[in-house]
Amino acid sequence: MHFLNLIILILLSSSIIIAQDEDETIILPDIEIQSSIGDRTRLTPGSTNYVGRDLMDKLRGLTVGEIIEGIPGVISEMDDGDTRKANFGIRGAHSRRSRKISVYEDYNPLNFAPYTDPTTHYIPPDERIGGIEVIKGSGQLTHGPQTMHGIINFLNHRPPKKGAGKIITSFGESNIGPRQQYHIRYGRDFGKLGTWQGMFTRHDNRGPVKGDIIDYNDYFLNGDIELTSNQKLAITLNYNHEDSEYAEGGYGLSQYIADPEMGNKRLFDDTFEMDIVRTSFAHSYYANENLKIDTNIYYNFVYRQRWSQTDNEENGLTVRNDINCTSAGSRVDVSGVTNANCGYKNTPRRYHTAGLETRFYKDINWFGKPNNLKYGIKFEFEKIERKARQTGSDKKQTGTQMAEDGTEFAKMSEDAEVYALALYLEDDIQATDKLIMTPGVRYESYYLIHNDRERKDGCGATGVTDCNNYTSYEKDEYILLPGLGFTYEANNTNQIYGGLHMGMAPPAVGDAGYRQISNLKSQKSFNFELGLINKSFEDKLGLTFETAAFRTVERSRPVKSSLRTAGTGSKLKNIGTTFSDGIEFSANWDQSRYSKNSRNWFATLSYSFMYPKLKTHQKGERDSSVDAGSVIVVDDIYENDIPFVSRHKGLLTIGYGMPNKWNISTTARYRGEYFTDIDNSKGIGQSGRWGQVDDYWIINARGNYTLTNFNNSTLYISLTNIFDTVYIASVSAEGLKTGNGRSIMTGIEYNF
């Protein structure tokens, strides 16, 4: 490891020396921060997608998740009314809290602790997103640590060079209650101080069930400063405060059938509170015409806590048993149930993530061939604190469990630190006039220190004094991930691309808890893809399309066992080998590209097919009758579908309008059925924690009208789930969650 680090550092140092030997200063009229500007995906090997702000405004998704759903191979499980929980998956990745992909904002990590607890409970408000990038091919090796399936990067609006602002107000109603969203931003040039922009966003939206209210305020400041003629500094400061009513526990099957919108009946105090502070300093230095150096320093702090009076048990959503409720253990939909005398289960989490990354972009000639090198190094530090306690109704600790060392956290107290180092190298080799070969390699290493101070169950209740149940362990891992991509420009209208690479994902605490992840292996994958982009018919027919075929072979994928005894709802285990074969297709048609009519039709089609298979021989585990019944061993799971991966996903949008004036469109969105356990159980269990999720269709529509006499401000209206389709949005260890019902939103974007 030390030898490899030394070699890389020598390579980096040599580049700096070369730069110093050449011209010291180069005048560049416009310097861009590589991680913050525009559609970079066209410069990345392999399959990529980019959704710009214009398309986002045209589609008017109810949430960011609906925009993400339109990208081939990408899914979004929208179970909270505002996509705050960011359940994104790419090419067969389990979407739960986006733990198996890397999620960024201006290439600063949004996964709370990327190496150990990569959960996401936050994405930027859709109003301040300038674009969305998705990278699925070998180009993701320059990011990480999750490199098996793909990455999603949200790009913020950059500060305007001339004074400009925007006010966005959105009001609407869902079948649960009102929805309100406000956004204001303004930016201008402050001379030598640079261009700066401030944004404020507020969301107050009802979720898909009664008792769910997503409520947050977001404060954002970014600036671009021209330090010299060849240096630029981009600064980002962000504070987000959320105070939502959200029940983590989901339904049982009978509750979903009886009333899919009941939630916690608004009888119980289930809340989610979160404070996020994010800051980054990104410096770009053009050493000369052939060398650019980007350095990014970032720090994220997250403090979130959940207060819950309900939980999912064998028979569905119930009043918690461990908080002294009068109706403890009763289903929330039982007549006369109450939260009298209820305390709370409180689960605070604290995350610190800090990093330093330097990237070099070097243009050179080797053996007479142009080469575009991209190489870099990243250091990252994470500190995580996870606690749980039981409290009284005043939210102060009560109960019989003994406190540890006089502190208040009696049920669970654990912390972890991670020290990570990543090195990467990618080279675009112009092999011929039409062929670019892109070999690359990534080296990942991390060191984990974990301390667990959990108390034994029932400690103090029966006079037991030996309550210590401490564990502590250390873990390190090193892995080398090679890759190779290619791009072949057959002509100006056809491009063939492909590649292969190895990927990895460290075991996450969400897979099994810190105490168990020491027994889980990192996932590793072999990824293959071949794709075609065709624009032959763009000028004459306004038609472009792209298709890609891929295979992902995973080793040691953690999947949910069907062992349904009490208390094992969230346990996962390494399953062995899995194969995910798939085809993605997307097409865009725009009549205005060839027609002289003032009004024209347009359409978008995307479709993804997956064939996800378990390729390991292993006996499944079922119970004899109900969820907590006697466990019996069943048939071999070989060739069963991988849990949580649907075979079919599609979207079709058809619209009509006058460019830059008005448009109307409708969208049909389809998600195929999928299983949630390795046994591929055909029905949903009574607890709602496992089983087969049925397919569904959702129909949306929207319209936009531009006010040309008012700085091109826009009026819009959006209808989501027009036919009020009832469907299951997600299934997890906490039960099942229903999706958003019918919603209507209208508003104005006023430019000034």
Model-derived regions, located:
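Face-selective signature of the C-terminal outer-membrane beta-barrel domain
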Residues: 229-238, 274-313, 317, 321-455, ...
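Transmembrane beta-barrel wall of Gram-negative outer-membrane proteins
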Residues: 164, 173-204, 208-247, 271-287, ...
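Conserved C-terminal beta-signal and adjacent last beta-strands/turns
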Residues: 187, 238, 427, 498, ...
